[in-house]
Amino acid sequence: MQKLENLSKNQKIILDLIEKSSGPLKAYSILFNVKKQGIKAPLQVYRALDKLIEIGKIHKIESRNAFVACKNSNCQVSKATAFSICESCEDVTEVSNLKLSKYLSNFADKSGMKYNKYNLEFFGLCKNCKK
């Protein structure tokens, strides 16, 4: 993973915002929140987001078209990610499960297809919402 000091100013600003967020953030919400810090155009946000994904600092939640900070220092960022998403409160938890990773690896091998990456999203109710 790339060190924080190697990030651009825009990447640092956006990473800081995403890390402090209590939930996934959409690109235009990010733009709205960083305008005062000199990031004025959507393209600036998308470039920073792309780089932060590439280096493993954040993940994209495909179903929400939103972004979250990577909480798992051992994750295979660009290859395999899985998330548990609460349908009630929208809480997102990164799933780190060795058995799941092995199963999906075997699945890819048996299917004969070469997967570049996968992003799994599990939906349900978190422990707080199912009470």
Question: PLM features: residue spans?
Answer:
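Short amphipathic alpha-helical elements of helix-turn-helix/winged-helix folds
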Residues: I13-S21, N33, I55
